[in-house]
Structures are given as C-alpha cells and as structure tokens.
Swiss-Prot record:
Biological role: Has no antimicrobial or anticancer activity.
Principal place of residence: secreted
Compartments, as annotated in UniProt: Secreted
Keyword Amino-acid biosynthesis on entry: no
UniProt keyword list: Amphibian defense peptide, Secreted
The protein, known as: Aurein-5.1
InterPro entries: Frog_Litoria
Species this chain originates from: Ranoidea raniformis (Southern bell frog)
GO biological process per UniProt: defense response
Tissue-by-tissue expression: Expressed by the skin dorsal glands.
Amino acid sequence: GLLDIVTGLLGNLIVDVLKPKTPAS
C-alpha cells in the first residue's frame, strides 16, 4: 500500500544517512 511505499522511501533515506559512502545507483 501507500504506507509501504512511504516506509520504503524512508528506509532508503536512512540507508543513505548511515552509508553516505555508498555510491548512488
């Protein structure tokens, strides 16, 4: 559902914050 999409986007943002050295695909 929409909530799943929102949580997915938030998860990606958190990963980007925790792993800033990871190159964006």
